[in-house]
């Protein structure tokens, strides 16, 4: 994992990593889900088959607390709405968008500012895309297994703190036995804290290993 913090008048933070499988993508999205707040925008970019829908599905299922939730691609409906415990999430696919006028008609960015927006093909949004956001760029990892992906996460504006915290969380988990554990989001309390149960399956007579992960932003 590589980090590249950027200092400017507008805060930004970026880091990159390689993921070896869909399960690894799901773990990354579960960790990101722990940090999201109302009003966040996540932009998923990459070519056809890069893994945008896989990321979106994993993130939504984690936020919903339902690992088998049906998450259809909004390629034709353009926007799919999910009323989640923490906020409403709008999952948009802008592949078929061809003009700024169509973006305006979607009302994707003009509705409740507390909504979280998860956007595939964000480059079709043009200048309508908010500056405060989390960009996730996916690409095939050259010369490796077909399921392997390179992922670059960049936070700009208010998104910079989320991405920097995610980078710190991954470094922390990589120092523990739970880096590859299954993440299960737990109901939070009235504070800004969020929680996940980490589970490593046991083998034979060895029971599962579990731990509680708490995100407590200052």
Listing of model-derived features with the role each one plays in the protein:
Residues 66, 71, 75, 79-123:
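Conserved nucleotide-sensing/catalytic segment adjacent to the nucleotide-binding pocket
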Residues 152-218:
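Conserved NTP-binding catalytic cores of kinases and kinase-like/nucleotidyltransferase enzymes
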Residues 41-43:
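Short hydrophobic/aromatic beta-strand immediately N-terminal to the Walker A/P-loop
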Residues 2-15, 109-169:
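Short phosphate-coordinating micro-motif centered on Lys-Gly-acidic
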Residues 52:
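Conserved lysine of the Walker
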Residues 20, 24-35:
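Pre-Walker A adenine-sensing motif
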Residues 45-47:
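P-loop (Walker A) phosphate-binding loop of NTP-binding proteins
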């Amino acid at each position: 994992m590589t980090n590249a913090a950027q200092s400017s008048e507008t805060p930004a933070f970026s880091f990159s990593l390689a993921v070896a499988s869909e399960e690894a993508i799901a773990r990354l999205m579960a960790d990101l889900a722990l940090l999201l707040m109302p009003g966040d925008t996540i932009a998923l970019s990459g070519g056809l088959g890069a893994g945008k829908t896989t990321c979106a599905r994993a993130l939504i299922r984690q936020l919903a607390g339902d690992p088998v939730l049906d998450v259809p691609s909004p390629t034709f409906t353009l926007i799919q709405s999910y009323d989640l415990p923490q906020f409403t999430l709008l999952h948009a696919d802008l592949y078929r968008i061809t003009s700024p006028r169509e973006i305006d008609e979607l009302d994707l960015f003009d509705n409740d500012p507390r909504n979280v927006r998860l956007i595939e093909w964000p480059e079709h949004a043009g200048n309508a895309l908010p500056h405060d956001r989390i960009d996730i760029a996916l690409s095939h990892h050259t010369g490796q297994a077909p399921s392997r992906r390179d992922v670059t996460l960049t936070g700009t504006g208010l998104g910079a703190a989320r991405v920097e915290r995610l980078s710190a969380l991954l470094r922390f988990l990589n120092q523990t036995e739970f880096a590859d554990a299954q993440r299960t989001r737990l109901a939070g309390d009235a504070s800004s804290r969020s929680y996940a149960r980490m589970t490593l399956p046991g083998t034979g007579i060895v029971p599962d290993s579990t731990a509680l992960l708490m995100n407590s932003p200052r």
